[in-house]
C-alpha cells in the first residue's frame, strides 16, 4: 500500500512538473509583452523604483525609431492599418513638394476654403495670396484643414489645368497622390481627403515612419514642426501666427516636455494619433502612434 502511495505521489509530481514547464513555455512570453499585465507591471516598477504610476498608453499601433541607426527598437502592430486623421497631411505635403516650390505664390480661393468640414481644425486661411511654405506651416502647426484644401486645389490645377472647379482639382490631386504613394512603396496607405478628415482612409505606423523620415531631411520642415507657435510672412508683407496643436511643445501645458522637438498630432472621433520627434543625450528618436 505504501509503495502504491509513493507511485501516486511521484506521478503527481511529474504531472505538476510538466504543467509548470508548459505554462512557462506559453505564458511567460505572453506576459512579458508590453501591453499585457500593464497595470501590474507599472505597480511593480513603481514599488521598486519609487515613481508615480503612469497612465496606461493604449495605442493600437506604435513604432519607435532610433534615428542614429534607423533601428526600430519598439514595435506594436506596425503593419496594422489605422485611420491617420490629420497625420494624412504629412503624406499630402510630401507629395506636394514634388509639384511646387516653397516660394511659389498661391491664391487661396474661397471655393476651396469653403470645402472645410464644419467643426474641423482651421488655420483661418483667407481669400488672399500665400506662399506654399505658409500653407505647409498652416497644415503642420494648427493642423489647418482649410490650408490643406487650398494646397490640394492649387496642386490639382498644376496637374490638370483643364479642371474647372476646386472639387475637380482636389479629386485630381488625391488620385495622383494615391498613385504616388503606391509608386513610393507606401503600400498600406490610401487617402481620400487632403485634410485627413476622413474615416475611410488608412495607413500604418511603418508608412508614417517613412514619410516623416523623408520630410525630416528638410530643414524648413524641422523648423516649422519644432515651434510652439509659428509666424508666417505672407506675399503682401502681412503676418499670420498659428499656435501648435502639439501640447508637448507648449511650456504652459501640463504635457510639456523639453525633449520633444516635433512633429504632429492628429485626431478624429475617438482616434488620437501622434508623431513625436524626441531628442536626448544627443540622439533623436521618432515615435509614431496610431
Task: Describe each model-derived feature in a short phrase.
Residues 1-13:
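N-terminal Lys/Arg-rich, disordered targeting/topogenic segments
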Residues 5-8, 22, 86:
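Short alpha-helical segments used as structural interaction elements across diverse proteins
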Residues 6, 28-29:
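Conserved SxxK-family serine transpeptidase/carboxypeptidase catalytic domain
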Residues 13-27:
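Hydrophobic membrane-insertion alpha-helices, especially the h-region
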Residues 29-206, 215-216:
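Active-site-adjacent loops and short helices of periplasmic peptidoglycan-processing enzymes
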Residues 186-190, 199-207, 212-290:
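Domain-terminus/edge residues, biased toward the C-terminal soluble/receptor-binding domains
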